[in-house]
Amino acid sequence: MLNHPQLIDLLKKAYSAEKAAAFAYQGHAASVKDEMEKKEIRQIEIDEWLHRKEVLQIMNDFNISISKHYELKFYIIGKVISASCHIIGWFMPFYFAGRLESGNVCEYFRMKQYFNSIGISTYDKMLYEMGIKEKEHEIYFLEKIKTNKFLPYYEKYFSWGNNQSFNNIDLDKKYIFRSREGIYWFLFSLKNKFRALFL
């Protein structure tokens, strides 16, 4: 039994939100003309389905039920976004996908913090890897639009772009942490103090 209401809700929400993201990427991949972009976005969709599966594994470990409310809510959101990708042009799907992924990075590190606060470190490696994968997604989308003429205007109003992010992870550096299974390397660092990652 997991006695942490915030963590339970975060797990339920993440599980359903990953489905919304996967649906959105289905529409995004279908809307682009470049075959390489289609392939890359479809791989990101696969990553989201895998994350959903991994979150469910954690939920099952604690007999946490799936939220019907979140499932319906994010199903609708995902399908609406998927359809909209065909009518809003090339730039906007890439921009808002990157912005979304930027925030998702923090969610998995927040899960780790919550687990650690109640003495559980079993999922440290999994949650780090999921957070890092979301960061890789963010960087992919940003690289696609970083020189686009619309980006400065969107960044000004939506607070994400070349100069702003919703996390402070740097994939060019490494951090080591120990777990019961040994030492693991992860390709990230903090621009500020390590503890700031979990605020």
Segments (PLM) and residue ranges:
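Non-heme di-metal
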Residues: 1-199
